[in-house]
Amino acid sequence: MDHRRALPPESLVAMNSAASSGNPFHTDEGARAAGYERAVIGGLTTYGYLCSYPLREWGARWLERGGIDVRLRVPIVDQQPLQLSAEMVSAEIRARVEAISETQFDSMAQLPNLGPLALAVAWLGGPGPLPPWSFPVTPPAAKLSLDQLATSQIISLPSMKFTPDVAWCSATLLSTQADACDLGVLTSEVSKGDPLPPSVIIDMANLALMNALDLGTWLHTRSKTQHFTQLRCGDEIEVRTRVLSTEPGELGLVSVFELAFIRGQNVCARVEHSAIFTEGALANGPKDRL
């Protein structure tokens, strides 16, 4: 029999921090054109909300060896009241995000019985740092269009290098309504050398894809992350990306990418990142499942 223990629930109001990302869904104008009341918040923000539970339960140990599988089921709009809840089931944390009042939003009122807007399973443990993999195909020199992504045999994308600084890490914590203490930092501010907020990893993943692909309008639907060793604010990180699958779906092109986050000679984290490239496919109104 599974041992279950409820973790403290939390109420918050969704905050859109992705208005300048270039994705039309993250602006009021672009989201309204697709049938939403307000801008759709970035998936990395919801990811950050859900990471609060393993961070508070396991602290820095989770960033050293742990993982999370986040599934984004229904778009969340800016200023939407949310309820976070979770329980420990045996050795896993199972968390969810739900709407507190769907009827406050005309677009949400069209979708009865939404259920959880996002779900996550988090775990503690996993292998240590891995050696970087080698890519069998030379990355393209220019951005790929979605048509090229769908029809080409290219399975690797250009790598990209980042050095997440204090300002980046602090802004990410602010957007996910988290505090530095969630990372195991004793002060309320992030400093160079402190643990990297997990949402910064997803931010780097998005930027790496935006650097390599002409994305247009897209929806983040899933991120499965495994930490192999702790990344820190100020680290020099190379992100290498390869395409796992691309196929047509009901709402657009469905693609799955694998990204390695490399410091020095070791893969410190790996993300399986899924997205739907809609090209306006949601113009007839919001969808209740992604």
Predicted regions, residues:
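HotDog/MaoC-like acyl-thioester-processing domains
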Residues: 1-15, 72, 77-158, 227-290
